[in-house]
Amino acid sequence: SVQKFYNDLRSQGIPVGKDTLHAYLGYLEDAFLIRTIALHTGSERQRMVNPCNAYPVDPGLIPIFERTGRPNLGHALETAVLVELERRGLQVAYVRTREGFEVDFLAMSPPRHPVLIQVCLDLSDPTTRDREIHALEAASKEMPDAMPLLLTLDSTPPQPPLPEPLQWKPSAAWLLDWKGE
């Protein structure tokens, strides 16, 4: 988010204004280098106050934006899922629950039911597993008409199995599964 980037720059002693950073973000979008998705909410004020999540237009651009120098496969997988959702012509937003948990995507295409999508590289770390599942569960309780879906890079089902009504699918199978309905 712009706020995080602003805080990072300020902590490094680099003077910059938030308006300038928002303008630069707009330039990057105009140049088709990044895309942003907004918070799903009925309140325009809430949407404006909460930062948009930014993603590169192509997972291959992630090393350019990644400052640690390490590969970020989780972010690459999220970006690939977002690109596919947009290719499918779905409206995409992210969800923040009342508890403060975030779900990566809410994909909507009326009259179909919305789909809550949480993307996770793998669930082998118990802390990661708990965080990802708890966020998806909380969002599915707040949006009972939405199908909660967890996508992972792993091709083996998570153990122990996910609680109802959460569904799991390997990301590769999901990416290849669109029927255009």
Residue map of PLM features:
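Short, hydrophobic beta-strand segments that form beta-sheet elements in well-ordered domains
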Residues: 144-153
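Hydrophobic, well-ordered secondary-structure elements that form the walls
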Residues: 85, 104-105, 117, 136, ...
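Accessory nucleic acid-recognition modules appended to NTPase machines
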Residues: 1-113
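Short, charged, amphipathic alpha-helix that recurs within catalytic cores of restriction-modification
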Residues: 122, 129-144
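Domain-level recognition of nuclease-like catalytic cores that cleave nucleotide substrates
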Residues: 153-181
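Conserved beta-strand segments of alpha/beta enzyme cores
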Residues: 91, 147, 165-167
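Active-site ExK catalytic segment of metal-dependent nucleases
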Residues: 108, 114-124
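Short active-site-adjacent structural elements
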Residues: 103, 125-128, 157-161
